[in-house]
């Protein structure tokens, strides 16, 4: 009788499921299910194209889709999908580090910075942001009616992936 073999580990060694809380894993599973348009258990170029189309972006180039798929070490099943997000998030600075960086521009400790000022800083200092990156940030985190950016909430979302209740 041959001994039973354990399931092969995904590249990277450690258990990717231990990197996330159960609620986060469920959210990733929902995202994976939405992206797996043909419901075959894998995300491929066709799934990505259909996902972009569903989001209103119809002019995605083949090369862009190929580059996205090439980021994975092989076929993208849910475990690989989760591992890829884990690797991307592993390099994310802790919330306190990001907050401290914003606090440099907020000496009075108000918790917000003028959006125009932060835009200027991000586009002119080392590690410059592009106009497109600035637009994406302000689309996701629009300034308030006074033109201020709530950087405390922004930091929370960057590090936790969701807004505070």
UniProtKB/Swiss-Prot annotation:
Its domain of life reads: Eukaryota
| Binding positions (Ca(2+)) | 36, 38, 40, 47
Q: Which GO terms describe its cellular component?
A: cytoplasm; mitochondrion; myosin complex
Query: A Pfam family in this protein?
Result: EF-hand_6
Which SUPFAM superfamilies does its entry note?
EF-hand (SSF47473)
- Annotated Gene Ontology MF terms? calcium ion binding
- Report further notes: This chain binds calcium.
Specify the protein name: Myosin regulatory light chain 2B, cardiac muscle isoform
Q: Which organism is it from?
A: Gallus gallus (Chicken)
**What lineage, starting at the top, does this entry show?**
Eukaryota, Metazoa, Chordata, Craniata, Vertebrata
